Amino acid sequence: MVATVNDILATIPTETRQALMAQMVSLSANPDTDAGEAIALQSSNTDTSNGTLRIAMECAYAPFNWTQTTDANGAVPISGKDNLYASGYDVQVAKYIAAELGMALEVYSYEWDSLIAAVQSGAVDAITAGMSPTAEREEQVDFTDCYYNSNLVVIIKK
């Protein structure tokens, strides 16, 4: 599945990734208010006959993922949480991957320290939660290519 997801991620242009992040930063300020604009990353595939992709995330790390009380701006229901929805950069990327795979998407909220265990146990299929590969994590799970690249740095006086 890693190679397939990498192929899907490779179809997302840098400009679209940047536009999506800018959009999510803006939307995270008032997530329950419908901005009335299309999400920057969209799939044209509406076929969900290949099953369900179960994704884990914290739903608490804006602009990557957050919890809201409406389905505004492309948010998806959080499985097992009545009237709560997830949105953010990670959610929109997960929606795109699921659509391109021909699958429905289910989002599950986990504490950060429980994400890898959720994949290992089979409770979910994957994590989209801004998690970077480390040697320890790579012993436990497989990683796709990066779906977000940051140029954040520390600024120091010369």
Predicted regions and their residues:
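Short, low-complexity, polar/charged sequence segments that are solvent-exposed and flexible
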Residues: 10-14, 72-78, 108, 145-149
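A residue-level marker of the well-folded mature domains of exported/periplasmic proteins
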Residues: 23-31, 36, 41, 134, ...
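Mature, folded catalytic cores of secreted/periplasmic enzymes
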Residues: 5-6, 119, 151-154
